[in-house]
């Protein structure tokens, strides 16, 4: 028997979530807002990520954060659930830092991605 699982995240900003999914080349939509599961089960999601097997995954707002919602038995992404969330969270943090930096007058001057995936970002404030 299969069912939807909801996994907590630290993702709170919908625009940053969308941008981070785009950065990872993950196709998503908000058109129908329905995640399809096993035996025609459905649940609401703010963002839907279609899968080739027709068992979608998505993100739903719980009032505090966006939770990943999926029927994990039918997970069909290039990464495991844990790795997917780690990559997405890293990208979300990166985009969040850039947004906050830009809002406070900073801009990136150097970025290095290490072999282990660690991103080193150097910011600078422009002072006229």
From Swiss-Prot:
It is found in: Plastid, Chloroplast. Keywords: Chloroplast, Plastid. GO terms for cellular component: chloroplast. Its main location: plastid. Coiled coil: none annotated. InterPro entries: Uncharacterised_Ycf35 (IPR009666). The keyword RNA-binding does not apply. PANTHER family: YCF35 (PTHR39638:SF2). Belongs to the ycf35 family. This is Uncharacterized protein ycf35.
């Amino acid at each position: 028997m299969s069912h939807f699982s909801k996994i907590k995240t630290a993702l709170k900003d919908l625009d940053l979530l969308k941008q981070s999914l785009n950065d990872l080349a993950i196709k998503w939509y908000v058109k129908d807002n329905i995640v399809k599961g096993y035996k025609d089960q459905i649940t609401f999601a703010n963002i839907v990520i279609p899968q080739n097997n027709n068992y979608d995954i998505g993100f739903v707002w719980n009032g505090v954060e966006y939770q990943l919602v999926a029927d994990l038995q039918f997970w069909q992404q290039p990464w495991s659930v844990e790795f997917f969330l780690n990559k997405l969270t890293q990208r979300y943090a990166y985009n969040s830092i850039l947004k906050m930096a830009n809002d406070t007058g900073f801009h990136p001057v150097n970025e290095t991605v290490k072999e282990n995936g660690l991103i080193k970002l150097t910011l600078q404030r422009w002072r006229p």
